[in-house]
Amino acid sequence: MCNNTAGFLALSGRVALCAIFLSSALLNKIPNFMDVVAHMEKEGVPLPRIALVVTIALLIIGSIFIVIGYKARLGALMLLVFLTTATFYFHDFWNMDAESAHVQQIMFMKNLSIMGAMLLIIAMGSGPWSLSDCCTPKVACDRSPNT
């Protein structure tokens, strides 16, 4: 795959991947700040107000870095920190009754899958059609049938 197709797919993937984080911050956590703080407090999150401010910053900054492809590895690390912490505080299915555990196990596995995507970005970078890509030397397209 070369140039336009790879670039379009990489950018589309970055946007789709970060949509959940941006919408969570902008449409839930910020407008419902005190309700989210109360929920975090109930779940035992230490210093919930400060934790929520840090969470919002991680979600927005990390997502923007990934979407525009500038410092995408750092952005992915920021979101990985958020995901790891949130997953173990809010989706601890092993501490729940069977009825609640099923839904939380699905949420846990969803987050685990997204963590895998963050690890891929940390390992491989943002890909084409990114600010990082436009500032690095170009390599000729590999047209071999195995790619």
Label each residue range with its predicted role.
Residues M1-N32, L47-I61, V67-T147:
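Extended, low-polarity transmembrane helix blocks
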Residues F33-P46:
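Short juxtamembrane and helix-loop transition motifs at transmembrane-helix boundaries
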